[in-house]
Structure formats: structure tokens, C-alpha cells
Amino acid sequence: MDGLVLRKLGRRFGAVDAVLDFDLHIKPGEFVSLLGPSGCGKTTTLRMIAGFIDPTSGSIELDGKILSAPSGSVPPEKRGMSMIFQSYAIWPNMTVSQNVAFGLNLRKLPSDEVKKRVGAVLETVRMSHLADRYPAELSGGQQQRVALARAVVIRPAVLLLDEPLSNLDANLREEMRFEIKRMHDEFKITSVYVTHDQGEAMVTSDRIAVMNNGRLEQIDSPYALYSRPKTRFVASFIGRTNFLSGNCGNHMIDFAGFSVPLAMIGEEVSGGGPITVSIRPQAMKLSATEAPREKAINLQGSVRQSSFLGETWDYVFQSTDSGLQFRVAAPPADVFEVGAPAWLQIDPAQIVPIAD
Amino acid sequence: MTSVSHPAASTWSDDQPVKVRVPWHQRLQPANLLWLFLAGILVVLIVAPMWTLVVSSFTDAKTGGWTLHNYVEAYGKERHITALTNTLKMGAVVVVLKLAFGVPLAWACTRTDMPGRNFVRYSVFGAFIMPPYLAGVGWILLAGPNTGWINRVWHSLSGSTEPLVNIFSFGGLVLVTAIGGFFLVFVLVSSAFEMINSEMEDAANILGAGPFKTAMKVTFPLVMPAIIGAALLSFLGAIALYGVPALISIPARYPVVVIQLTEFFSFPLRIQVAAAYSIPLLLITAAMLGLQKLILRRKGYVSVSGKGGERRIVKLGRWRWVLFGYCFCVVALSVLMPMFVLLLAAFSDSWTAGFSFSNLTLSNFHYVLFEHSSSQKALVGSIGLGIVAATVAITLALFIAYIVQRKLIPFSGLLAFLAVSPYVVPGIVLAIGFYAAYALPPIALYGTYTIMALAFVTRFLPIAFTTSSAGVRSIHPEMEEAVRILGGGRVTALRHVVGPLLKRTLAGGWLLIFVPAAQELSTAIFLVGPTTRVVSVVLLDLSEEGELEKLAALGSLLLIIIVAVVAIGMRYLGRDFMLRRS
């Protein structure tokens, strides 16, 4: 199978499974993020891919060749990968161009070829004018660019990124996200990106693998992950959401105070009994007057809390009938006082049943 | 429970049989062989000599069979037992003296506004550079019973014919031993004083404690572990020292262990008995260091671990000159006076004639450089051995420290233990071990530079290891992982990244080894051959021949070369490289 394949991958430290039964197939040229809270096993997974940690179960293969297995692994230096580290790990004893040339020199390329490639990649990351500087003379963002250049210049089989932006300030981080995306689009390197920042993962990735407690929760495109979360963890970790408990039966889901026909919601549901759904704050609309819309669920109630976040309002709406509370996002022009009566419309197509 | 129908994260992996084996040639890292090689070196340097030492102490010299006779012979004579108890007594008194010298100086230089702090610091550093046996010679020139300068001044002043001071006495022995080693107390205790954050003392002040109470209740308890550690090391240094007893304890008729050991090594050669007799020295050292570990492990003694914050300087007022007076006395006794008389003697026709222009000459230097049979070669040999020992020890230690810090192999802790274990072996005992293991046929390295270089490397491996280990710990592992993921092995990472990053640390460690290695006496004494004498041994020969002026000239030359090397090092490393070590 082409690409990078993790098969039932597991790593145990003492009595703790840091990673367990992790299956993942990354196609050639794909950019996949491992996203999860700290301690979820994403960095362990990445370091297993790099070869710094051996798995205790399962295997890793690249283009059909086994790289890692509990019985032994190909060492990192023989994998033809490259990596961008959290600390950048730019060698302070070498200049920018020496840092970038290091991997090429290890590959015993002729020196004019090395020079040409280093020049070209420094051009790409806009660092040509600083080629002879030492790392101590560079800013954090510039060091990050050097790390990026050093990693891509060898045209690695797989590029691994270990929270590369976590040491940068917010503005720079935003800029570097697009930089990384741009580099990927330009070189089409199979990439695995570890982060706990969903924004980073959303911008850069073709697909995001959400991890929790050493296991894969869901892998999907950023849009699918946001609009169709499959588990409670994914729904709450990616963006904000409302969880509602209901009961499923007779082609309807019954919630406190209202019911939705199964046919109207976007997902197929089989069987019956208790069910949990996720409704994003953006899947609802608040209005001051009763203006029932076709195919929408209309609830009457009032605004209980409000906070202004700049790009949106964050309201808490409480239904009069059931007392249920909803977080609702509204554009800045939709101003409601706390305590004001309001009507809520929910788009049933955006109600997503989830597994607990 | 309702089941939401979505496909499991992926199911395709179940379809395919999993073959999990990476071919061995892909798994092979050439570096792994290096680790094996290093373990082999440590066996040669440490395990084999020490094992041979212990085994030969139980071996019958004639039959080669097992025996306890060596122990009977070693401890059967009252004289031999006296030497043991004398050694312990001397060690105890030396510790008291070294602390009395080192602790006040360390406090004065780090925590007070005493004038001349840098002068005191440099002078103490001079004590590090001057080998103890040269200080001993200096004091023989100063306080020899008949011709010592102090006594001659006393005779002419008082008309008495009795000496005022006599260096050939128990007092002389402990004084000279103490001045030759108190710099270690100074270094350890000053760095402890520098680690204390003044906020700890401020906290006591704000609660109502005065300066004296604060010092007694807060400051000194915090440096106590350093003082205890320094005291133990002082004791071990004192009982293992060879040069000073060789000069003083024989004329003083005060037999000590090291001198007794040389007796076993003179004709008739009794290595097995010497081995048996050196075992207590080894056991005492091991026990002392074990004791230190035990004391330091106790809770409450761990507070001096933080990074030093801002330190408050104690304003001494009028007392600053009193303290300076005391410090001056100590550095005068330990460095200035012996160094001065040594230089003067080196340039004198006859040191007993006192100072006059007619007495000045360069002939002593000419003699040791061009006429004497072995001193010129010895200078080259000593400096060369110093360079080789420092370089090999640092290189070896860097690799070992790397393996240990990065936990590359199972039981890497054992490598660390081996690398620091020569610490508990006094130089003279190490020499006996090397003699027993490698001097005689079939290996027959006796009298070669090789056996001395090996022994010196072993002797200084602990310093090298401690320095390298701290250095490696300060390097982020990702620095090396970046090398490896780009296709370089661990050895490449060591050569291109770890090594260059540790250049300064390693150079500092190199100097800390070079200085004592170029002067080393106790390890050399049993290993030198007729054609491979080192300066320290030639100096002792000259002292036995009574050629003190020529001895002084040769000693000065050695000092000048070492000072030059250290000066170059300090230019490159900054002057405080020695104090930064803890």
C-alpha cells in the first residue's frame, strides 16, 4: 500500500498505554494532523513514525516497506524523513546555510548542487539575506523558517512536524500556519503535523485525526470534523457545541419540549432508545419576533447571558417550555439585552447524533 | 442504546496479514559497536587493575595459590599498624586546618566587602596550580631546622642555636599538607555560598533575626553540605597524598601509609603485600564517600539546589581589614612565601647564602634544561602526559556521558558508575593496581609512557565524566534528533553538534585535568621506568640528592609552562571556569 501506514500501532510505558490500536493510512502527498489535548499520545505517535520510539505493538510501514515493529525498527537516520521540532533544534554552532546544507551534505551531494538547493530553499522561505547569520542572531519566526527550510530541502519521504508553532506569539503563528501550508502545496510532501491547536490543524490539514487517551477518535477533513463530529469528545474539542439528550423511536427523536423527525436530520440513525446530539451555536438563529421558518424547529424563550467576542455574539438562550439552555452565535448586528424575550430557530439538518 | 451508523475509523487493516519484521541490516546502527568498545576500555582502565589488586592481595607470590599470608605480613608488624593510625591522625588534623583556611576565605570572597577579594581569589588559584610537593620544598627552604630562612633570621636576631620552627615534624607535615589542598575547600564552599539566594536571608531578617543569628541559623546551615563534602574530600586527599610525606615524614620520623607502601615496592619487591596493605585506604575512601552520600540524601540538606539569585554583600566595617589580614596570612603561608623562596632558590648559586646579587645565577636553569640526564626529557614527558591524559579522558568521558545521559543501552548506569569509581581509588593504590595488572610480562608495560598514560586517564576520568555529563545534560535532545532524522547517525550528531556545542565546557574540563596530570606524582611513582621519568619524580630525586636550587629551577619551569597553558585557557574561557564547577 502506498503512503504511510500505521497498523494497530501501540506503545506502552510501564502499565500505561500511551497509544493503543492506532490505525491510520496517509496517502502520498497528503497533509494529516494529529490533534488532541496534551497527553493524548499524539507526540508519541509522531516519534514512533520518526523512529525515535519503538512500538510495543503493531507496525508502521512506508510504501509497503516495514519501518517499525515491536521486534525492531529502522533507525531514524535511515528513514529518509525529516522533522520540525518544537524547540526548532537549529544548531547554534552552524550558520543558517550550514544548518540547511547539513542534510544534503550527509547525502554526499556535490557541493555546487548543495549550494544551489540551499539557495533555492532559502529563497522560498524568504531567508536568503540572512544565510550567513548564526541562529542566536535570529528571531523566533526566522528560526522557524530555517527549521522549515532545513526539513524540506532534502525532499523527505515524510515530513513530521511536532507542534512547530507553539513557541511563537499569536500573530507570527498565524503567518507561519499559512507558510507551512504554502510549503506543502509547493512541494507536496507527505506530512504529519502534531498540534493541540485546532486552528492550526484546520488551516494546514487535508485531514485531521483527533486523538484522545491514546486512541483515534475520528479522522476526517476539517469541514467534516466540524460539521459532523462522531463522538462527544470530538464535538466538544473542535469548536463549541450544545449537547442534547433525547429519545429515539418511531421515526422521531424526542427532546424535552420538542421533537424532530428522523428524516430531517442529516445522519442515518438505526435502533431506538436514548440518544445524544450535538448542535453547533452556528446552527441556530435568534430573532426578536416570532418568525417561524419552514423545516426549522422554533422555540420560545429569553436571553440569559450575553458576551461579545468581536466577530460574534455569544448568547445563552433558555427555552420557556423546557428550561433547556442553548449557546447561540449571532452576528454583531443582532443585539439582545439580557432578559429580553427571543425566539430560537434550529436547523434540523445540522443536528448531529453522536456516540458518547 | 441507539447506535449511530458511521464506519469505524478504519477497518481495512484487518484484511491484511501483518508481517512484522525489519531486516537486521536495516536495524543495524554502527554506533552500537562503539558502546561495546567503550565498555571494553572501561574494563581495561578500571575493572582489570582493581580486580588484579584485590586478587593479588590474596595470592601467594611464590606458588600463585590462595593465601592470607600477605595480610599477615602487611599488618603483622607494629610499625605498619602505627603508620596506619598515624595516617588517620594526620588526615583528621589536616581536615581541621583546611576548613580553617578554606571556609573563611570562601565566605570573605563571596559574601563580604573585604578589600582585595580578587587578590585572594587569584592567590588561591595559585595554590591549585602549585603542586603540593613544590609547596613542601618551599617550606623546607623556609623552615628547615638549621638552614631554613626563618630559623636563620631567628638565630641572628636572638643568638639562640635552637630552631624556632621545624618543618620536619608532625606540625610541619600537616601544615604543608593542608596548604597544598585547601583550594578545593575554597572552590566547593564558595560555589555553595554563591548558590544561596539572599531572599532566604531576607526572609529571616524580616521575621526579626539579626545578622549574626541569620548567619548561624540560615546561611551556614545552607552551605553545610558543601562543607561536609569538602571535609571528606580533604581527608581523602590528605591520606592519599604522596609528595609531601615523601619530603617530610621520613626526616620527621612519622611513618605514614604511603611511605610504608613504597617500602614494600623497594627491594625485595612485595607487590602482593603492598596490595594487601592498600586495601584499608580503598575501604576508608569508599566508606567516606558512602557516608557523604548518606548525609546529603537527608531531607533538609537539599535546599542549595536553586539557581543563585541576587546576593547581598555583608558590610564588615572596620572588621574588613581584620578579615583581610587573616586571608593574607593564609595565602602568604600557602602560596606567596613558598613560591617566593622557590623562585629565589631557583636563581641562587646557593640557597643557604641568602639574597645577594653575587649569589644570582641562571646556571640552575641551564643545568636542568641541558645538563641533567633526565630533567629535560621529564619536562617533555610530563607536559605530554598531561596533554594525552586530558585529551583521552575528556573524549572517553564525553562518549560515556552521552550514552548515560541519553540512556542508549540497558545498564548505562553501570557505565557511569565505572567512570566515576576511580574517584575512590587513591592515586598510589591505582598505581599498585596498574602495576599488578599490566607492568609484568606477558603485558610488560612497566616503565613505558603507555602505562602511565593509561593510569592518568583512569585517575582523572571522574572529573572528565562529571564535566561532560553536566554538559550533555544541558543540550536539548532534539538537537541530536534533528541530525538523525536528516540521515546522520549518533556519531555524526556527536561530532557535528554535541561536540562543538560543548567546546567551552570540555576545554574547561581539559584544563582541570591537564594541570594536575602534568604534576601527578602518586600515580607515577611506581610506574615510571629509568627512561620515562616525569618531572615530579625527578624533583623528588633531586631533593634526595640535596640539589634544592636545581629542584627549584625545574619546579619553576614546570609551573611556568602550566601557568602559560592555563593563561591561554582563561583568555578563551573566562577566568572563572574553575569556580563554575561544582
Which sequence ranges carry the predicted segments?
Chain A
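ABC ATPase nucleotide-binding domain helices that frame the ATP-binding cleft
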Residues: 43-46, 146
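ABC ATPase nucleotide-binding domains
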Residues: 76, 80-82, 86-233
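ABC ATPase NBD Q-loop/coupling interface
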Residues: 59-79, 109-111
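The feature captures the beta-strand-to-loop junction immediately N-terminal to the Walker
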Residues: 35-37
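ABC ATPase nucleotide-binding domain
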Residues: 5, 25, 61, 343-345
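Helix-to-loop junction immediately C-terminal to a conserved catalytic motif
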Residues: 50
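Glycine/charge-rich catalytic "coupling/switch" loops of P-loop NTPases
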Residues: 252-307, 334-356
